[in-house]
Amino acid sequence: PGVLVQPDFYRYTATIDVNTRNPRGNPRRGGQYALRYQRYDDTGRDLFSFDRVDIDLQQYVPLVRDRRVLALRARAIMTDPDSGAEVPFYFQPTLGGPDDLRGFRHFRFRDRNTLLFQAEYRWEIFTAVDGALFYDIGKVAPRRQDFHLSEFERDFGIGFRFGTANGVFLRIEGAFGSAAGAHFILRFGNVF
């Protein structure tokens, strides 16, 4: 769907975002809790109309006077097509790449629904350099009922973050766990 026929959409969005992260650019405590609902209405033949719900929950637990942080994230994206309609492949959520399942190539997994959990242990090495150990687990599925913990993809790794309290400007990571081998990540900005 969406390859041979390019539909036009009306898109409606409602968002709730509560942000208590402190500091916001490189959080050491607090959290961010976001819920977004989107409605895509196919303006033509109504073959690709669907609803989408994104839930992104992040929590930062300070340890040892904010020099060490446990960063946790849970994210779910669920799409629900209208009866007889489909979600175009380019609107289907994906997993894989430097911001979610880091041990897998970009867009490695794609389907109508995704579920992702991430945990990072971050510690200050020097004033502008942090170390990070991370573990990611996630899955895509055609139906929400198909999420079984034993079938989730997993990865882990280590990295370094360069930045200030205002934000991370560079992130270097090594991610492991996929059959494709190790992945080296050089990225501007924080993962979450």
Where on the chain are the PLM-derived regions?
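Short active-site-adjacent structural elements
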Residues: A141-R144, A180-H183
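A short alpha/beta connector and helix-capping loop motif
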Residues: D146-G159, R171
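Hydrophobic alpha-helical segments
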Residues: F126-A128, A132, V140, F162-V168, ...
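Short leucine-rich amphipathic alpha-helices used at interfaces
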Residues: D99, F117-Q118, D146, V168, ...
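C-terminal outer-membrane beta-barrel translocator/porin domains of Gram-negative envelope proteins
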Residues: P1-F126, L133-I137, A141-P142
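A short, acidic, flexible beta-alpha connecting loop/helix-capping segment that sits on the rim
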Residues: G174-A180
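Outer-membrane beta-barrel "beta-signal"
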Residues: T13-A14, I158-A165, G181-F192
